[in-house]
C-alpha cells in the first residue's frame, strides 16, 4: 500500500468518525462534557373519583404529539385496575377499568419530559375541514363574519388573529355575538374559532397544555389554538392573540373534550402537577437513541459490562500516552528507549 492509499484511507476514516461524532452530539444529544446534565420535568396527573355499584372505567388523555418536547419515560400507578393505552382523535388515552371498587379511588399518570426541538415538525398536514352544519340565520352570520375578517386580513395568520379579536369582542360584534353565550370560557371561544375557520376552509384544532415551570406545584391546563396555513401549524393564544408556541408549553391533549372522563362513578377530580429536575445527559441520549431506532448504542462502550468498560478506558489512553512520549522525544529532547519507551 503506497502513501496515497494510506492518506485516502485515513481521510475516509476521519470523515466517518467526525460524522458519527456530530450525529451523536447534535441529533441524539450525547454529552460532550462528562458533567453535563439535561433539564427534565416530572409531570403528574391524579384522578380521584367515587366508584358506583357497577363496573368503572376512567379515561385520561395523556401526552402524545408534543412539539418541542419528548417523553423520556412514563408510568401508571393504580391499585388492581386493568390498564390499556390507545391512540384516539384527541391524542393518546389511558383507560383504567375495574369490575368492582369501593371507597374513593385515586389513579396516577407520571411522565419524565425533556426538551427536544426536533419534534416540532413531526405533525402531519391535515385535510380541509367539512363546513359546519348550521341553520339559516347562523349560516348567514358566519358568512358575514368570514367576509368581514377576510377584508381585514392578508393571509392565514392575520385572518386567525383578526378572527380571535372579533370573538373576544363578541359583545360588540353583530356576527360573533350570535354564537357566544355570556360568560363563555377561553376554551369555548377557542373551540368556536375552529368552527369559524372550518367555514373558511382552514384546518384548525384546540390544544390543551400546561406550562413547565421551574418551581414545583400544581398547574392548570390552558387552551391554545392550532391553525394550519398549508405548510405548517401556527399557534395562537386565544386570550392574548399572541402567535407562536410558548417555549415552556407542553401540549397535553387536543379536541373539545376534557382531560378525563368517567363511567360508573361520580365526583371526578383531576389535578396536574409539575416539578423540574436535572438528569445525566447520557441517560437522556440513550433513551433518545432507543426511541429513534438508532443502532449507534449497539457499538458503544456503554453497551459493555462495567468491568470491560474500565479495561477499555485504560486501553484508549495508551495511544494518547504514546503520542505524548513521541512529542517529548522529538521536540523536547527527552531520551527514550526506542520510539515510545521513556
Could you say what each language-model-derived stretch is?
Residues 332-342:
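Membrane-interfacial loop-to-transmembrane alpha-helix junctions, especially the N-terminal start
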Residues 191-266:
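Hydrophobic/aromatic-rich core segments of domains that either
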Residues 62-64, 111-115, 124-125, 208-211, ...:
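A mature extracytoplasmic/lumenal domain signature
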Residues 3-119:
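Intrinsically disordered, low-complexity N-terminal segments that are enriched in acidic
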Residues 88-95, 102-184, 199:
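Acidic low-complexity segments
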Residues 25, 328-334:
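Membrane-interface capping segments at transmembrane-helix boundaries
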Residues 184-190:
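Gly/Ser-rich catalytic serine loop of serine hydrolases
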Residues 239-329:
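Juxtamembrane membrane-insertion context
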